[in-house]
Amino acid sequence: MSMTAARGAGRRAALAIGAVAVVAAAAACGASSSGTNESNGKALTNTTVLLDWFPNPDHIALYLAQKNGDFTAQGLKVTFQSPSNSTDALKLVSLGQVPLAISYEPETITAGTQGLNVTAVGAMVPTSLNSLIISGKSGVTSPAGLAGKTIGTDGDPVSAQMLKAVLKKYHLTLSQIKLVTVNEGLVPAMVTGKVAAIISGYRNIEAIQLAALGLHPRVYPVSTQGVPQYDELVIIANKKKLATDAAYRTMVREFLAGLGKGAAAAQASPAAALAAISPVAKGYTPAMLKKMVYATAPLLHNSAGFGAMSVAQWQSFANWMKSDGLITKPVQASSVVDPNLVPKSGS
């Protein structure tokens, strides 16, 4: 199983209960039905954004920008589409079959070693969400106590290496724990006591679910525990088209400008973000969704300005992936990151 497939199939399975395979959810969320920008009468440019999975709290900036008309103000009519498979984004953008998509920094770096025609153009969630989460009912009070315990994962090899790095900080190795792939989902495995902890869960999603279920989770974001900082969710675009198609490059700039407005609005008003995502985020109770959205909103903050990505930070993470055997070829971060399309800070 590829790392992207594992990340989607394992981690997101528990989130999408009752959801259908493909969702096109933009039309009713604020895009102009007339196909024109009402402020100036100009025709809107249609574009599609392929999500990484079903609509969920990680996507609040997208849906709030849509609801507030921020994309329309940039001259765009944006459609969000959920993938039929979580490996779709990189492939379809590389082939030019969808203009933009949501992906992850580790997968984008891996795509660079595979020759895929993609580049990251903006960080939507500019910090790591992946966390080691320990059940409060396990009797384990810190990662140091995980020796001899069973830890669940979604099968993503990146997460396994992240766990290795976390354990190293506490003078443990993977050989001292039992790592199992929990096909039934990370949260059910914790609830049933099959595992004492999970890796691959997000601090703003699974940690909230587990707390609501009374497991009193202890949450350790991997980037605070020995893993290099990275951008969890990124916008990816077609690299060749960016270099050769001026209209496409303009569209990407306009999309990022609109998304930046949505991210700022979500941070300023998590209640507004909740109202925007609630109609499309399925499989959550209203109370749980609210807690997730309120936990997610501050994580959108980027001290360098919305969407900003550090090529040096990406290089550090790519080097870590290479040193841990997650990629077999070295990657020049500048080949998979284009940091020049996001709005200038303060604009």
Language-model region placement:
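Bacterial signal peptide processing site
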Residues: G30-S33
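Pocket-lining segment of extracytoplasmic ligand-binding domains
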Residues: P106, G185-A189, G193-A281
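C-terminal motif of bacterial Sec signal peptides marking the signal peptidase cleavage site
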Residues: A25-A28
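Secondary-structure end/capping motifs
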Residues: D245-D324
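Bacterial N-terminal signal peptides that target proteins for export
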Residues: M1-I17
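Conserved C-terminal helix/tail region of periplasmic/extracytoplasmic solute-binding proteins
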Residues: Q315-S347
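Hydrophobic helical h-region of N-terminal Sec-dependent signal peptides
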Residues: G18-V23
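Short, glycine-/small- and polar/acidic-enriched structural segments
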Residues: T36-N183, V187-T192, A196-N204, V219-Y220
